Amino acid sequence: MTPVRDMRSVLYATAILFALAILGLRGAFIWFEYRDALDRARAATQDLALLMEEYTKRTLETSDLLLGEIIAFTRLRGGVGALSETGQARQFLADLTRRSSASDLFLIIDKEGNTVAVSTVQPASPVSFSDRTWFKAHRAGAETFVGAALVGRIANEILYTYSRRIPDLNGEFDGVAQVGLRPTFLQEISRPTESDAEDATLGIWGREGRVIARTGLTQDQVSSSLGQTSLFNELASVPS
């Protein structure tokens, strides 16, 4: 006959082992749930990144075609200098805006960096963009340029830009055709959902780390950069 004390010891040991088994199973379930949550978060992030990439690509392709129409219109009428003598350019840009669902503000800039035509209300006097990075790039020979986020001098709101160099009949620099784009798409796809999407920050950054578009971006953050961060440098080193 087993002594009562030994029986109690066996029962205590069994209870302890059972409790440890329960804790082990619970820990395993928590680990599996954690791994599953990570996998789902990773998949959702990849889906968002692909969606943003495709949208950005299509937006820039559409903008490129529309800017091509502006360049053709400009050259057909004798160049950028000739456009300042009539109001046809502003009307053409306004019509182009109505035909486009993605583009918000069209500009034609002369070779000195001053506005010749704007798709919105024409400024009382020409606005100079000669100090902008994109203008300097085109004057130096760049055919196209995707600009970082900025506060528009005409729209006075956060935009990112895509522009093309306008050549004259001899191929020399005659000005710039540009479209300013609002990053509304990022705000739309980052609306809060049951998956805690409100904690996600969506953005597009240039090769040097300058922000092009980002959710929650404020005017005092448009010059921010990720260029010196280890994460950006690691991503930049991955072959495309």
Short names for language-model regions:
Residues 1-5, 146:
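Short, Lys/Arg-rich, polar N-terminal cytosolic tail immediately upstream
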Residues 4-5, 10-12, 18-82, 98-102:
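Juxtamembrane extracytoplasmic/periplasmic/luminal helical "stalk" adjacent to the first N-terminal
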Residues 42, 60, 82, 86, ...:
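Solvent-exposed, acidic/flexible segments
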Residues 47-54, 65, 69, 91, ...:
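Generic recognition of well-ordered alpha-helical segments
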Residues 77-80, 118-122, 215:
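A short gly/proline-enriched turn/hairpin at secondary-structure junctions
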Residues 97-107, 111-201, 228:
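Extracytoplasmic/periplasmic ligand-binding sensor regions of membrane-associated signaling proteins
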Residues 207, 219-240:
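Extracellular/periplasmic juxtamembrane segments that couple receptor/chemosensory ectodomains to their
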